[in-house]
Amino acid sequence: MTMHDRPAHDRPVHDRPAHPSQARRTVVVGCVMLAMFMAAVEVTIVATALPQIVAKLGGFSLYTWVFAGFLLTQTATILVFGKLADLYGRRPVLIAGIVVFLVGSTLCGFAWSMPALIGFRLLQGLGAGSIQPVAATIIGDLYSPRERPRIQGYLSSVWGFAAIVGPLAGGLIVEA
């Protein structure tokens, strides 16, 4: 049996100490929550701002593809990024996903047409596909099964907070 044939919990993780301190775990959870917030708030900002975006870019017939393209690439890549995190380590895969997500987000802001926006949303979804599975894996690495429900509660609260902040931010962006 090779190293890559063993279950993930039996494999060494390249980018974490054997027994991280509570302070380090807190910092890591904060960073993971921030990454998740970026992906979560993006959806609600776009949902609020998209009618204005479509009015400026045209292409109403492509409206649903702005969301569908993002979700399709995000969903399709979740398993891929989970495996890559097992092979290459959690940190580099999460950071690469965040970078791809941010590049896609920036390019969305400069989109000149609806097809361009959809293409950039595909890129954004690709990056977002790494955030959720790698975040859950990091929590599994850092916390015992007994501690995980509490931390998963913190991570879940990010989605609730994003649901409040996103529409407000989207409205401000549209009105600015």
Locate each region found by the language model.
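Transmembrane-helix bundle of Major Facilitator Superfamily
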Residues: 2-176
